[in-house]
Regions:
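Short Pro/Gly-enriched beta-strand edge/turn motifs at strand-loop
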Residues: 5-12
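Short consensus segments that form the blades of beta-propeller domains
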Residues: 13-19
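Short, contiguous, well-structured surface segments enriched in hydrophobic/aromatic residues
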Residues: 22, 26-32
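Active-site-proximal loop/helix of nucleotide/amide-processing enzymes and allied scaffolds
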Residues: 51-177
Length: 177
């Protein structure tokens, strides 16, 4: 499985929009006895509506991190730039250049990726999967096919999340939303 498809599989299974929480995980490399390289991910840490730190593997090399932004903040008191990596704008709200991105070291998505020198993937409320490469400062859209928040005014698809929740006291019955 190529890495972006792997990320899509992992991140499409989280309940970020319904819960309006961020989730974060580390992507790590596995080399089999026959030399074949594969990837896996750590159990996703659940954060709050605006931040989360990825869980880390014990014995494997981290090659990237992946996280989600919560639900769209369009109807919230506190507004965020939901559909982009944090750290992509300066204090005046203007986008920073690729060269400035590579130097960013604040406590934000771009700064964190730069400090650990690892690629970072982000799933946004509008349904896009983005990749930030700290080596060259580039942000690319990997996919526009992720689950999206119907409230997001910049929604790029009609993919909604079906959430299955166990009915209290009966593990054999589920409610589907």
């Amino acid at each position: 499985m190529r890495l972006p498809t792997f990320i899509e599989t992992f991140l499409s299974r989280t309940q970020v929009i319904r819960e309006s929480k961020e989730y974060a995980s580390s992507i790590y490399k596995i080399i089999g006895r026959n030399g074949i390289i594969g990837f896996s991910y750590t159990f996703a840490n659940k954060g709050n509506g605006s931040e989360c730190s990825p869980s880390l593997p014990t014995l494997y090399e981290v090659v990237a991190d992946a996280h989600t932004h919560g639900a769209s903040s369009v109807n919230s008191e506190k507004k965020y730039y939901d559909n982009e990596f944090s750290g992509l704008r300066n204090e005046n709200g203007k986008f920073i250049s690729k060269e400035e991105r590579k130097k960013e070291n604040g406590n934000n998505d771009i700064g964190n990726a730069n400090r650990i020198k690892k690629v970072s993937y982000l799933v946004t409320p509008n349904g896009s999967l983005q990749k930030y490469n700290p080596q060259n400062g580039e942000i690319t859209i990997v996919s526009n096919d992720m689950p999206s928040d119907p409230n997001d005014p910049t929604r790029v698809n009609e993919n909604t999340i079906n959430y299955i929740e166990p009915i209290e006291n009966d593990i054999n019955k589920y409610t589907i939303y």
